Amino acid sequence: MWIPSKLTRPGRLHNAIVRPRVLELLQQAPYYKLVLFRSPAGYGKTTMAAQWLADKTNVGWYSIDDSDNDGFRFINYLLQALNKATNGNCNNAQKLAEKRQFSSLRSLFSDVFAEMVDFHQECYVVLDDYHVINNEEVHEAMRFFLKHMPDNLTLVVTSRANPPLGTANLRVRDLMIEIGNEMLAFDTEETTRFFNQRVADGIDEDTANNLRNYVEGWPSALQLIALQAQHQKRTLAQSAESVSQFNHAHLWDYLVEEVFDLLDADTRKFLMQVSVLDHFNDELVYALTQREDALGMIESLNRYGLFIYPLEGEQNWFRFHNLFGEFLSHERQARIPQQEQELNRNAAIAWLKQKSPHQAIRHAQKAYDGELVAEILNEFGWKMFNQGELSTLESAINLLEKDLLFSNPKLTMLRAWLAQSQHRYNQVGTLLAEAENEHKKRNIDLDIQYQGQANALLAQVAINSNDPEKALELAELALSQLDSTVYRSRIVATSVVGEVNHVIGRLDRALPMMQQTEKLARQYQVYHQALWAILQQSEILIAQGYVQAAFELQDSAFRLIEEQQLQHVPLHEFLLRVRAQVLWCWNRLDEAEECAYKGLQILENHAPSKHLHSYSMLARIAIGRGELDRAGKFIEHIQHLMKQSTYHVDWTANASLSLILYWQAKGKLNAIQEWLNTAVRPENACNHFCQLQWRNIARAHINLGQYDQARQALDFLQSEAEKANLVTDRNRNLIIEAIFAVHQKDENQAKVLLKEALQLTNQTGMVGNFLIDGATIGTLLEKLTNRHELGDLERHRALQLMKDISSNQRSRSVHFDEEFVEKLVTHPNVPELVRTSPLTQREWQVLGLIYSGFSNEQIAQELDVAGTTIKTHIRNLYQKLNIANRKEAVTTAENLLQLMGY
């Protein structure tokens, strides 16, 4: 007796979401022999096939179960499905099958194809859940069927495993469409539609994306999350926030029933053991399980659709689906808890054989094996340090028992270096002193090599603390103590000697020392030290006036970061910071802004105090664009950070420049005076950061009309810059001197200084420093070019500067800043409506941005406010200016700009 439901298409598709991206791929199905839906349980293979074929007329459906491994039973159901798909064109063959009147399945299929010769319509036969078939006779018959079936027939197979139907041959000949779990997994858009269809409150894109990523788009898991959210009356956002605490009981029950209990005991044990690894290859699995057939087992499980995925681009590396991995861990801890420590210990040893200490440490910690952790740190700690794996190292060292830590001087030295490398300089001396004391308690002698390493480290701390004399003394002492084999500390000591020479203005000595440091660091693969040396060279070259050479050297630093995967090391932010400063000086503000924001991303997990440089640059960029409101927000950040932390003069000088430029633009002379009252005045100015600080002081005095003090500061600046051959700083100082001359009403001297500055700019390319004072020097530049007082290169540079100054002024006007609005409303010819219905400053800004072509969304982003707030501002300004629409707003803004001479 045949069961009709086995030949019935699935119903209840009303709740399934439409999958256009999958359906689009299936449009070409009539031209293929086989359409294979292959994925693990719960990916919606059957639902997708049914949805796709719902509007097709000639479809036969066969739902397979375990009992269909009987050849007679299988062939009869298959022929009934085929007969249905062909409108009864296989009746004779079906009768032969029912009466067992055929010698072989091949001969029967030959009769079937002969009967179908007059049927030319497109048709489909579906074999649903083919993975339960393990009868080789059936497989062989289906291979014959696929090879010889007519072109108008397409076979559709759903299976958890790769069916033995000659799929490799079909794939090579492009006769098969394969829909795998990558296609069947929901993307974020489909996840959003799925939940919106099931949950009354709907779902936002971020929540949908979080949930989708957690379950890797697995539809069954998403369905269970939706049901649980409804049952517990929780929003999906709450479910997403606590997704790791999600009640997995129903999901685990599903996997036990649909997957795990169907496996033999040996395979279940294998999966539970391997699940201790996040990702794995056959060598790891062999070391863990001692199974000679490790690779065969992995490939077999992959073929059978057991949630094992090959890693893209990796040879014989695999991972479990996230949730299946969690499920296996749960089963492992429930069924074989006594093996947990041993498995993790074996996993640690296996990872060591793969030269992966990071993973080995993780498993050694899970095995609660402190001695193994210490062994790994001893052997691989410095290598991991050189590769930038600082947080992993620090957490491992912090978890060691005191006896394990202080029994090994190598580990205590590593601990101190970790503090230094993460800018905790004030802890280094304490850590070294504690280590020395603890080692003595344990009768451990600290040899001269240890002392040399400690001195090299303390030298680095001294230079970071702005004590170059002490740094040089310690670095030279370290070099006299250290053997050439202790290469890391020798590299650091050499670097410190170079940095000291940089700080004290001996650039001709500093550069070769840093080049030597880079060479040694690359030779011994101490890559973050090589990166540091490149950055120092870049700053030295900038100071010497070779800015283009510095820029190109920075490119090599970016390559090093990419090659050695140092993207998350704090020095990456330092590189972006120096690059942003060069780009700002070259007036490439968009690129400088991008660097500053990237720097903030890199430091997002570090203390907010480290963000000062990025905010200083962002404020300067906003000031340069005339976006004073935006700049004001960055200035607030800067002031807050400077109150909260103590900084090196390099940091405070950069931040102070942004503060002074902002106060200068806003006319806040009291703020400038307050800053000047407490400003640090370095004893010398033989390096770029002390030069910058003294330039800030000179600028402050000029703004306040304190010309005698300004003159003294400028004389000191240029004297120091000349002594240390700081070419780029001389260039910047000349511009400030020209500003001073303008304030002194000495136009001739101002022009002489500007001419000299332009000549130096041919080498340095520095234009940003001209532009920040464009309103003061613009007229002088015009006079210089008109009177042919400049050489060709200087004239070209001056014309470009005038163009940029004009563009910046127009930009500020379009942004309708306070100064522009004040001039506008007092203009004798301004329309009465503008005078009697004054707009707020924010409404003027919005009008300017509308004129610039910004959409509402872009305006909201530019001013960093909500879209609804922008709509309110637009409604208000339309009402006040009697404007009906955006077009009229643009016309009004244009008329006002023309009135002001723009």
UniProtKB/Swiss-Prot annotation:
Activated by ATP and maltotriose, which are both required for DNA binding. GO terms for biological process: positive regulation of carbohydrate metabolic process; positive regulation of DNA-templated transcription. Residues 832-897 form the HTH luxR-type domain. One of its GO terms (molecular function) is DNA binding. ATP binds at S39, P40, A41, G42, Y43, G44, K45, T46. It comes from the Bacteria. Keywords: Activator, ATP-binding, Carbohydrate metabolism, DNA-binding, Nucleotide-binding, Transcription, Transcription regulation. InterPro entries: P-loop_NTPase (IPR027417), Sig_transdc_resp-reg_C-effctor (IPR016032), TPR-like_helical_dom_sf (IPR011990), TPR_MalT (IPR041617), Tscrpt_reg_HTH_MalT (IPR023768), Tscrpt_reg_LuxR_C (IPR000792), WH-like_DNA-bd_sf (IPR036388). Residues 856-875 bind DNA. PANTHER family: DNA-BINDING TRANSCRIPTIONAL ACTIVATOR DEVR_DOSR (PTHR44688:SF16). Monomer in solution. Oligomerizes to an active state in the presence of the positive effectors ATP and maltotriose. Belongs to the MalT family. Positively regulates the transcription of the maltose regulon whose gene products are responsible for uptake and catabolism of malto-oligosaccharides. Specifically binds to the promoter region of its target genes, recognizing a short DNA motif called the MalT box. This is HTH-type transcriptional regulator MalT. The gene is malT.
